[in-house]
Amino acid sequence: MEPGTNSFRVEFPDFSSTILQKLNQQRQQGQLCDVSIVVQGHIFRAHKAVLAASSPYFCDQVLLKNSRRIVLPDVMNPRVFENILLSSYTGRLVMPAPEIVSYLTAASFLQMWHVVDKCTEVLEGNPTVLCQKLNHGSDHQSPSSSSYNGLVESFELGSGGHTDFPKAQELRDGENEEESTKDELSSQLTEHEYLPSNSSTEHDRLSTEMASQDGEEGASDSAEFHYTRPMYSKPSIMAHKRWIHVKPERLEQACEGMDVHATYDEHQVTESINTVQTEHTVQPSGVEEDFHIGEKKVEAEFDEQADESNYDEQVDFYGSSMEEFSGERSDGNLIGHRQEAALAAGYSENIEMVTGIKEEASHLGFSATDKLYPCQCGKSFTHKSQRDRHMSMHLGLRPYGCGVCGKKFKMKHHLVGHMKIHTGIKPYECNICAKRFMWRDSFHRHVTSCTKSYEAAKAEQNTTEAN
């Protein structure tokens, strides 16, 4: 009995877990389920309350839209989603080591940040998981409808799911595994062979993990080693511009006694680039112009002043780094190969200058480790909201819809600019002729021409008065 009251307080410690277990049993039996999630044609029944409580994405879907049927993008792996859905009821998630990146991608889209954080911890503590993923490229393929059973596989984890998982468990338990991890990563960095096209993104992540493990050498060393990458790796649809000379002494320090067989010097960099240039064919000039346009859009980070015609253009940030995101972009990959080879040829002449600039930036205190929220494509962000917005770009989501015409946009400021069409607001006014404009680009063009006309008329008037 509580002091000073006539009431008794009792607690049921296991009650909440028991409730979730019963809800999970109901879900498996299809009882009292009030929402269906469709992933690549596979239908998963669930409870709105559980989904809304475990995922902000589902919370928006069931509360704001009152959806009874939610269709997820085809890039989502049905088996991965089923395991994540099961974890919402059980609080446990078994992730095969080669598929951790797939779980990270799915959880990022669903905004289940507790899963994202755990996946990030596993990747940071076990960088060899990425090395295993390089050898299991086929694991990213979504199961076909003829061979996939959406209701059976996740419940057979005791027999099939644990076959790969103990590997990651052993890596976490063994002290000596850290040395083998560094050796394995260093061997990836010192290879002369070209990596597969679907592993360029993972290789950037390998460099990141090496930088985090060697953080004892100082902030500048960590920042420097973070941006190192192999002499050449097949690019995604967007060309990478981070070509940096790898110092042999840096590799020796990072590997702690590892025998480095390859020595990278200026001659080998040029030789590797020349080999790349001979392997790729010349593309038409029109295709090159299209590539430059796409590259400019990515570098502009969807600038607020972009023209409305560009709002509906989708950019594949992942490129060929994952089979789910590759789609029908084989032509774009060829363009990326040729473009990156050209960029590398230009950078090889000034490679020492690039290294000097990088070292100077590291001494100024700029470190990529400050961005705590990474994306699978290799980009990192300082805030979760930025990563959410970035993930919507990957998946082609358009969450902002116009209530008048129904047109949808990726970014909120795109919708704000679109609403000017319906409201008729013209916020830009010319100071010379007082003409008003709805769009900023049109306003700037008019001001340029109007100013020239005004100055010409004024000069003509002055000449007439002088005569």
Swiss-Prot record:
The keyword Zinc applies. Residues 164-174, 182-194 have a biased composition (Basic and acidic residues). It comes from Homo sapiens. Belongs to the krueppel C2H2-type zinc-finger protein family. The modification Phosphothreonine is found at residue 423. PANTHER family: AGAP004733-PA (PTHR46105), ZINC FINGER AND BTB DOMAIN-CONTAINING PROTEIN 43 (PTHR46105:SF15). Pfam families: BTB (PF00651), zf-C2H2 (PF00096). This is Zinc finger and BTB domain-containing protein 43. A zinc finger (C2H2-type) spans 373-394, 400-422, 428-450. Residues 134-153, 162-225 are annotated as: Disordered. There is a cross-link at residues 182, 241, 247, 297, 358, 458 (Glycyl lysine isopeptide (Lys-Gly) (interchain with G-Cter in SUMO2)).
